[in-house]
């Protein structure tokens, strides 16, 4: 049987303030805004913004009442980087606080090991920068 060969299209994140979140993802994480849309509903407008960086795409969703949806949790969004030390330094220079002081390292995670560290976005979403070794 032929495999479906699925890839990740995007990750949707519920946000309280679309403008604050767009600025964070564009200015701090250097995502490009690729598309915006307002979904008209009887209960109020839902604001959507799609942003991308390399082959990573996210969808920011602001519900009409700016409250988190009941659609279930997303634990974190991991962003792939080639030089975690450099990216971390850039993010720190932009005021991003990290959850831990040290970059985590596991030599047995993935074929050649992995390094990662977590931080939070403007709506408390947990973000990770991750370098596969």
Give the residues covered by each predicted segment.
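Exposed loop/turn and edge beta-strand positions of beta-sandwich/beta-sheet ligand-binding modules
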Residues: 45-47, 73, 113
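Core segments of cupin and vicinal oxygen chelate
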Residues: 14-56
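Structural preference for long, well-ordered alpha-helical segments within the folded cores
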Residues: 23-24, 90, 123
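Short, solvent-exposed loop/turn elements at beta->coil junctions and helix N-caps
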Residues: 37-41, 64-65, 103-109
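N-terminal beta-strand motif that seeds the catalytic metal site of vicinal oxygen chelate
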Residues: 1-20, 74-79, 133
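Helix-adjacent hinge/juxtasegments
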Residues: 60-63, 67-81
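Short amphipathic alpha-helices in soluble, non-transmembrane regions
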Residues: 27-28, 90-94
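Vicinal oxygen chelate
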Residues: 1-4, 94-133
